[in-house]
């Protein structure tokens, strides 16, 4: 698969949001190639369904921030970024929900980036 990507302005950011519905399955099916070709500034991933240490997906020039669900094989979010955030917040500050790994927020200089995975119902 070849994707043609063209940046029009240097000061613009490229954001990608992708519900991967299980990152382990996607990782073996060209995920790294797509990731590299899209060359986004920020990749937000939802429904990663991973626990800490289950997979090692690092990309040159990117730092990653993961929010894992306590329950195995359930929800989870991650953000890969080329830019250093001012701060990172995991969850929404509600203990009842924060164990599900549904939210990662990056505070950037000019904006907040919130990666969210919400239930269907």
Feature names for model-found ranges:
Residues 49, 55-121:
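Structured beta-strand-rich core segments of catalytic domains in phosphoester-bond hydrolases
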Residues 2-59, 69, 74:
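N-terminal, active-site-proximal structural segment of metallo-dependent hydrolase catalytic domains
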């Amino acid at each position: 698969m070849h994707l043609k990507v063209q940046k029009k302005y240097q000061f613009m950011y490229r954001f990608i949001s992708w519900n991967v519905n299980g990152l382990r399955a996607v990782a073996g099916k060209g995920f790294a190639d797509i990731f590299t070709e899209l060359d986004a500034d920020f990749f937000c991933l939802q429904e990663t369904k991973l626990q800490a240490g289950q997979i090692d997906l690092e990309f040159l020039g990117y730092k990653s921030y993961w929010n894992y669900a306590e329950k195995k094989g359930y929800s989870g979010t991650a953000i890969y970024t080329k830019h250093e955030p001012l701060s990172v917040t995991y969850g929404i500050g509600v203990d009842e929900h924060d164990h599900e790994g549904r939210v990662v927020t990056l505070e950037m200089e000019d904006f907040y980036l919130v990666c969210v995975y919400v239930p269907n119902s």
